[in-house]
């Protein structure tokens, strides 16, 4: 019998098939790495846009001057977007490096993605609350409707908050990706049948 046929029958795959499979795996991992890198760079652009827009948000008229720094919610939004922009750039560089992913690295990305998702979500939420008070006012806490006198300021703040919510969506997607990459490393649990000595996988990937 031909040796190539024997190897095919015994091993199930020829050497050519193994080489082709490994190349396909490399191409797939490379495309996944590129996609994740782009996904991590996209929120950085939005973070910088929201940050710069809010930093330049100031209006002066006959009623006085109103700046983003006068409101703690907007200061937090600036800081949160700055932190997320830096993390997005750093994580994109790390992901783009062609190195094998370890369990500790997967856990680190999972943890940081989750934390920063909630950080930027909180920034967007408190900014919306501040904008609501600025537009509607609150007599109980003697908060006047500032948007009546500072309409331009409020419009820029709304735009920055909307962009921040887009960042939240991006980070939610990143959290899903890092969760999948982490928990897909764990094998399926085995189900044992007592007395029969048979173990089967509960599910297959």
From Swiss-Prot:
Its main location: membrane. Residues 56-76, 127-156 are extracellular. It is found in: Cell membrane. Residues 1-34, 98-105, 178-205 are cytoplasmic. It is a multi-pass membrane protein. Pfam families: CASP_dom. This is CASP-like protein 2A1. PANTHER family: CASP-LIKE PROTEIN 2A1 (PTHR33573:SF46), CASP-LIKE PROTEIN 4A4 (PTHR33573). It comes from Ricinus communis. The chain crosses the membrane at residues 35-55, 77-97, 106-126, 157-177. One of its GO terms (cellular component) is plasma membrane. Residues 1-25 are annotated as: Disordered.
């Amino acid at each position: 019998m031909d040796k190539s046929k024997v190897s095919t029958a015994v091993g199930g795959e020829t050497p050519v098939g193994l080489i082709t499979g490994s190349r396909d795996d490399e191409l797939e991992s490379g495309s996944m790495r590129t996609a994740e890198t782009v996904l991590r760079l996209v929120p950085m652009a939005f973070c910088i846009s929201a940050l710069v827009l809010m930093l330049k948000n100031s209006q002066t008229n006959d009623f006085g001057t109103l700046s983003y720094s006068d409101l703690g919610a907007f200061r937090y939004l600036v800081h949160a977007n700055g932190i997320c922009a830096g993390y997005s750039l750093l994580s994109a560089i790390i992901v783009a490096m062609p190195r094998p992913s370890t369990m500790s690295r997967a856990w680190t990305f999972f943890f940081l993605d989750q934390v920063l998702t909630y950080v930027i979500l909180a920034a967007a939420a408190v900014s919306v609350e501040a904008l609501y008070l600025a537009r509607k006012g609150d007599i109980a806490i003697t908060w006047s409707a500032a948007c009546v006198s500072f309409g331009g300021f409020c419009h820029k703040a709304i735009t920055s908050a909307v962009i921040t919510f887009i960042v939240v969506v991006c980070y939610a997607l990143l959290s899903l990706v890092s969760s999948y990459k982490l928990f897909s490393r764990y094998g399926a649990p085995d189900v044992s049948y007592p007395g029969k000595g048979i173990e089967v996988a509960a599910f297959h990937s």
